[in-house]
Design a protein with these regions (language model features):
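Structured, contiguous alpha/beta core segments that scaffold functional sites
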Residues: 1-190
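A contiguous, surface-oriented mixed alpha/beta subdomain in the mid-to-C-terminal portion of proteins
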Residues: 110-285
Length: 285
């Protein structure tokens, strides 16, 4: 999956971006800053790691060669070099700047290759894109004035001029303010000589809701985030359970593994760069 595509897909679905930002917020909030990394740098690296499956931290060296800080290198524009350990900043096709030696590259494991990481949610990306497509289609459906779509069936004493006038009126009814009435006078018309046959109005509505619900479930399953933590309202007659219990379980199953992944930075640098505060458990009530 191209990195540009992952960047564009970050906000295609509210459930997709919200789940990512929830993880970023919780991991970043648990950081105990050190002299080598600040909160802003760490947050950017965490977000890149979850969105792209890759996080890069470039060392800042002192005159004596020691590491005095780590700065964030955007995963969208960072590439590995041909020589192992070389990393390049490539914001454009004709632009490339070699990063300082010793770049820390955190990558989510992939079963097919080991050069770059792959985000965990990739299996649900098509569902997130379908969710966006359904929303955009529905929005255009209202903006272009074709709310229902119908066939106007006419027989009887309607001459060519009247037929053309009806066509012109129908064309003028499209677009903003399309809810208009139409008067048709057929002196010798019979019952049923003019019929309006709707096209899939109810079916389109049901299909839209079905797509939204199905894709939401796929995205949330890929991110493994409890629905009550994303502000989702339970269906009528159902409940999600205690949000404190859900938060505690989510923290243990998802946030702590992310913290463990970033502790690898310490092994790469050879000193304590990343450390986390002990989580204060919320008291029950």
């Amino acid at each position: 999956m191209p990195l540009d595509g992952l960047a564009r897909a970050f906000r295609v679905s509210p459930h997709h971006s919200s789940a990512i930002l929830l993880k970023v917020n919780l991991v970043a909030a648990s950081l105990d800053p050190t002299s080598l990394i600040d909160r802003a740098t760490f947050r950017k690296a965490v977000q890149d790691y979850i969105v792209f499956g890759n996080g890069y931290l470039e060392p800042v060296r002192s005159r004596l060669g020691g590491t005095i800080a780590l700065r964030h290198a955007m995963a969208r524009y960072t590439r590995r070099g041909l020589i192992d350990g070389d990393y390049w900043w490539v914001p454009g096709v004709q632009e490339a700047t070699k990063l300082a030696p010793g770049v820390v590259h955190l990558a989510m494991p992939d079963v097919n290759q080991e050069l770059y990481g792959v985000p965990e949610y990739l299996s649900a990306l098509q569902a997130a894109l379908l969710n966006e497509a359904a929303t955009l289609f529905r929005r255009r459906y209202y903006l272009n004035g074709s709310h229902a779509g119908y066939i106007l069936y006419a027989t009887g004493e309607i001459d060519v001029n009247d037929t053309q006038a009806i066509k012109d009126a129908m064309r003028a009814a499209k677009g903003p303010g399309n809810f208009r009435n139409m008067f048709v006078h057929a002196p010798n018309g019979k019952d049923g000589s003019i019929k309006i046959i709707p096209i899939a109005e109810a079916g389109a509505k049901d299909e839209f809701l079905g797509i939204k619900n199905a894709t939401q479930a796929d995205v949330m399953a890929a991110h493994r985030v409890p629905p009550q933590l994303l502000g989702i309202v339970p269906a009528q007659g159902s409940a999600f359970g205690n949000p404190k219990d859900a938060t505690a379980m989510f923290y243990e199953l998802e946030i702590e593994p992310l913290q463990a992944a970033f502790l690898e930075v310490n092994d790469r640098v050879g000193q304590e760069v990343v450390r986390f505060r002990a989580r204060a458990l919320a008291s029950g009530g």
